[in-house]
């Protein structure tokens, strides 16, 4: 539910506010697809943000998705979700925008991909490295890459 509101709903309300369009236009596929992809991205990312707190969750009796998947399962789930979401965005940008937007997105996701693979390889060797520090680095890098993408999109389309 949280992902739907933080992703889909926030995307639609923000799009509506920025573009000053009739609310009925929010139902078009050009707007619905990225709203759904935003939700999917958040749903894919959320379990990895909990990967470092399995012991605490278990002690409190919390049954999070990350805890149920296990550490490596959480990494696999997140990777699969990111790949599906990235393919969705690439298709969307190619179909509704242009190849430059698609390429910009892919280029700015490379640092995120490299870090994720690097961290995953470290976790395979030592499960203790699925920790708060690495999780927050992933969050910061993700925010930096995505914000850079959207900022450049605004600049190039201004």
What are these regions (language model features)?
Residues 29-43, 98-109:
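Alpha-helical transmembrane segments
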Residues 15-23, 54-58, 94-101, 124-128, ...:
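Transmembrane helix-loop junctions in multipass membrane proteins, especially transporters and channels
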Residues 33, 80-83, 141, 145:
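Hydrophobic residues within alpha-helical transmembrane segments
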Residues 79-130:
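Transmembrane helix-loop-helix
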Residues 6, 10, 41-45, 85-89, ...:
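Alpha-helical transmembrane segments of multipass membrane proteins
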Residues 39-83:
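Solvent-exposed interhelical
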Residues 137-157:
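Final/C-terminal transmembrane alpha-helix of multipass membrane proteins
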Residues 1-22:
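Intramembrane alpha-helical segments
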């Amino acid at each position: 539910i949280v992902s739907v509101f933080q992703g889909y709903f926030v995307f639609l309300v923000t799009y509506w506010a920025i573009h000053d369009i009739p609310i009925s236009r929010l139902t078009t596929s050009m707007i619905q697809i990225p709203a759904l992809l935003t939700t999917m991205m958040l749903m894919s990312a959320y379990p990895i943000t909990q990967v470092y707190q399995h012991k605490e969750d278990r002690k409190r009796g919390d049954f999070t998705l990350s805890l149920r998947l296990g550490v490596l399962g959480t990494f696999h789930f997140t990777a699969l979700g990111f790949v599906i979401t990235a393919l969705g965005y690439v298709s969307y940008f190619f179909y509704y925008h242009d190849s430059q937007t698609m390429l910009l997105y892919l280029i700015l996701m490379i640092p995120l991909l490299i870090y994720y693979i690097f961290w995953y390889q470290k976790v395979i060797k030592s499960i203790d490295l699925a920790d708060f520090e690495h999780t927050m680095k992933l969050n910061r890098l993700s925010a930096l890459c995505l914000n850079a993408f959207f900022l450049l999109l605004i600049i190039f389309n201004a």
